[in-house]
């Protein structure tokens, strides 16, 4: 993706913050896990699983945006991600029905993560839809000039 598009740069800034937050949580949780695995597994394993899942999704989005040709492509990528998660949440299985309890818990945690991803992807879509600050300033200046030109 070419640099210089305020909307994409702003979205990537927030995306990178989310990636860094999840990666930091993974490092911290992994350290706790290595210190006392049994206690960690009982109290914090879900958090580590979710951080790994979210970090992976964010990084896939980052790669897709980095390879995008233009703003329309980035917009489509974000919208496709929203649609994918919403489809999984609305039309997918609520229960995994596996004989493995851990697999069932992992499935449930993925659904929770997808709910958060929909919120995050919508935030990104809102950023992409915003008018860049310099354009806002120009529009405000143009409106002010027009008001001055109009007779009272």
Which residues make up each language-model segment?
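Extended non-catalytic scaffold regions that mediate assembly and binding
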Residues: 1-4, 25-43, 92-98, 137-147
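Long, compositionally biased, intrinsically disordered segments
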Residues: 1-17, 21, 67-77, 130-152
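Short amphipathic alpha-helical heptad-repeat segments
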Residues: 4-32, 54, 74-93
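Amphipathic alpha-helical coiled-coil segments
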Residues: 48-72, 110-130
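Amphipathic alpha-helical binding modules
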Residues: 86-148
């Amino acid at each position: 993706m070419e640099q210089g598009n305020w909307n994409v740069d702003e979205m990537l800034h927030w995306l990178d913050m989310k990636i860094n937050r999840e990666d930091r949580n993974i490092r911290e949780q992994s350290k706790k896990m290595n210190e006392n695995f049994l206690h960690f597994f009982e109290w914090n394993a879900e958090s580590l699983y979710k951080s790994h899942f979210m970090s992976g999704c964010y990084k896939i989005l980052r790669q897709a945006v980095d390879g995008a040709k233009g703003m329309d492509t980035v917009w489509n990528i974000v919208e496709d991600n929203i649609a994918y998660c919403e489809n999984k949440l609305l039309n997918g299985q609520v229960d995994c029905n596996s004989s493995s309890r851990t697999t069932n818990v992992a499935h449930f945690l993925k659904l929770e993560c997808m709910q958060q991803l929909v919120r995050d992807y919508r935030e990104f879509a809102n950023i992409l839809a915003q008018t860049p600050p310099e354009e806002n300033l120009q529009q405000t200046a143009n409106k002010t000039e027009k008001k001055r030109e109009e007779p009272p």
